[in-house]
Each structure stands twice: as structure tokens, then as C-alpha cells.
């Protein structure tokens, strides 16, 4: 195997019983000729169709297969995070278990990674998905992510990606953030590129994606943009807003004082209420900013709560 870096293939699995054996055969066919040490980490995300039994049979036959079973269905992002934690090699490749991603593209992704990039993201340029329910929402979401993140990829939702381990270790995932891994990597200084990959129609099982996921993606994108800019300095947001309100409030106070003391106009005007509202809002915003600073500092000084809980693991060096 020489000095070639090892590969960890991480696959979240949710009710893909009929796809697992042909998928593992294709992975073996694609990875064997590379001459690299490798492992295939399957993460069962609460499957109820017998997928775990199929995975155990695969692991019993092939020492490259390592299994992680979550206690219930936590979602794709926690499942991928569990796979990252239990993987061991310097290069990590992710793909779906539905046979729509093609394992034959893995060697190309790894070769593109080389010494020049930290993330190589797959681009399903010619997708085999329904236009209305999958392609249209995907195009809209990808456009918004490109514009808001500044990362010029075409297909953030493609699970087939190759990463250097150190980049994965530098980011934290929650919600539906797995699709933003290239964005997070770029924001921490990672070098990201894109490579066209094959995409096949689903022939077995049912899709876990739908229109509701687009809404979640957009909410996560807005949250991510806010957190990336202000998570370590919340007082820049609340403090700036508070100071602006206080400045306008004092300006309104000057106008009111001029009307009363110079012009002798004693009647109540809406400007008085606007002044009070601005001064109160500005003061409260400053206090909220100070409290947010304290909370954020405490948060970064403590260990984060995990987004998943493992029921059992199986494979080499693991208890079955």
C-alpha cells in the first residue's frame, strides 16, 4: 500500500435494504484497484426495514465494512457526523446509499483532491430526478447559497464529496448543515473545487427528499450566514442597533426640547412617543448585546452537546 493515504467512505443509511448489497459490491470494485487502505463506514440512521441485518452480513464477510447504528432517526447531518467521528483515515468521502451516486467517481474525486484542495464537491450536472419536486427547488436553493455564501459551486446538495479530515474537524454541523460543508470549509480557509459526477435514477426504495427540505435548507442558510458573521461578536449586531436607536432618540429629544423650551409648544405630539420608544429600544438592545456576549463566551468555554447518540457499533476493532 506504500505511503498512499487511506480512505474512509461514509454512508448514512435510512431504509435502503435492497440497495446495500449491490452498493457494497460497486464500492469494492471501485476502491480495490486504488491500492489504498480503506474502510466503508455505514451509519444506520434508525432504519426500520431490516437494513441493519443486511449491514451486519456485509461486515461479517468484508473487514473493510464498519457499522454504526444510531438509536433512532436523527437525520442526515447527525448521521454523517457520527460517520466522521467513527472514521479513521485522512481522506473522507461521503455518498448516499441509494445507488444514485456512482462509486466509480470516487477515484476521480480523490485524485482531484491531491495536494491542492481540501474539499472536492460533486456536481450532478445531468440529474435523473423529477423536475418540479427535486430539480427546481434544488436550482433555487443552489443559487441562493452561492449568492449568500460567496462559494461558487453549482450543486451543494450532492452528497458525493471528498474531504481532508482536518477540514471536517474544523467545522461543526447541526440542522441540515451537511450540504453547507463546502461553505463552512471555505469560511475556515479550506480550498474547495467542483467535479462533474454521474447521477443515476433511483430504482429501489423511496426518496427521503421533498419540498419541505428546501424550506429547511433556506432557514439553515440564513442562520448560518448570521452565525458566521456574528457568533463570536453578537454585540456588534445588538450594540450597533442599540446605538443607532439611542442616537435617533437623543435627536428626537433635542427636537422636543427645542419645541418646549424655545417655541413654547406644550401640546403632546407623536414625536414624544417616538423619542421614548427609540431610547427604550436602544437601551434594551445594548443590554441584550452585553448578555449575548456573556452567553457566547460561556458557550465556547464548554463542551457542546452531541447531535446524535450511538446504540452500537460493529466491525474491525469494535464490539459487535
Region annotations inferred by a language model:
Residues 1-29, 36, 320:
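N-proximal low-complexity "stem/linker" segments adjacent to membrane-targeting elements
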Residues 2-3, 176, 180-320:
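Hydrophobic helical membrane-anchoring modules
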Residues 9, 27, 83, 98, ...:
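Residue-level signature of catalytic and energy-coupling elements of molecular machines
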Residues 18-22, 49-58:
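Acidic helix N-cap motif at the loop->helix transition within catalytic regions
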Residues 35-46, 68-69:
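Short beta-strand/loop segment that forms part of the nucleotide-sugar
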Residues 44-53, 99-100:
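A conserved acidic beta->alpha catalytic loop
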Amino acid at each position: 500500500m506504500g505511503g498512499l493515504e487511506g480512505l474512509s467512505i461514509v454512508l448514512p443509511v435510512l431504509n435502503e435494504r435492497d440497495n446495500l448489497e449491490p452498493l457494497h459490491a460497486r464500492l469494492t470494485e471501485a476502491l480495490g484497484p486504488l491500492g489504498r487502505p480503506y474502510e466503508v463506514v455505514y451509519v444506520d440512521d434508525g432504519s426500520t426495514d431490516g437494513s441493519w441485518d443486511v449491514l451486519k452480513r456485509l461486515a461479517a464477510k468484508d473487514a473493510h465494512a464498519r457499522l454504526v447504528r444510531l438509536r433512532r432517526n436523527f437525520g442526515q447531518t447527525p448521521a454523517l457526523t457520527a460517520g466522521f467521528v467513527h472514521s479513521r483515515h485522512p481522506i473522507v468521502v461521503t455518498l448516499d446509499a441509494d445507488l444514485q451516486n456512482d462509486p466509480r467517481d470516487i477515484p476521480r474525486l480523490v485524485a482531484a483532491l491531491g495536494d491542492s484542495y481540501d474539499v472536492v464537491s460533486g456536481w450532478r450536472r445531468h440529474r435523473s430526478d423529477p423536475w418540479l419536486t427535486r430539480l427546481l427547488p434544488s436550482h433555487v436553493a443552489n443559487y441562493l447559497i452561492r449568492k449568500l455564501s460567496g462559494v461558487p459551486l453549482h450543486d451543494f446538495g450532492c452528497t458525493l464529496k471528498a474531504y481532508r479530515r482536518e477540514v471536517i474537524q474544523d467545522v461543526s454541523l447541526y440542522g441540515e448543515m451537511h450540504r453547507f460543508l463546502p461553505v463552512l470549509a471555505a469560511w475556515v480557509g479550506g480550498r474547495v473545487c467542483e467535479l462533474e459526477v454521474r447521477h443515476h435514477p433511483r430504482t429501489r426504495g423511496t426518496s427521503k427528499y421533498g419540498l419541505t427540505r428546501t424550506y429547511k435548507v433556506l432557514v439553515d442558510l440564513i442562520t448560518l450566514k448570521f452565525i458566521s458573521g456574528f457568533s463570536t461578536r453578537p454585540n456588534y449586531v445588538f450594540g450597533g442597533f442599540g446605538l443607532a436607536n439611542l442616537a435617533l432618540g437623543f435627536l428626537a429629544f433635542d427636537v422636543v426640547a427645542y419645541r418646549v423650551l424655545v417655541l413654547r409648544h406644550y401640546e403632546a405630539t407623536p414625536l414624544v412617543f417616538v423619542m421614548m420608544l427609540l431610547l427604550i429600544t436602544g437601551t434594551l438592545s445594548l443590554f441584550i448585546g452585553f448578555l449575548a456576549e456573556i452567553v457566547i463566551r460561556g458557550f465556547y468555554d464548554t463542551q457542546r452537546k452531541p447531535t446524535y447518540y450511538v446504540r452500537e457499533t460493529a466491525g474491525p476493532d469494535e464490539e459487535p
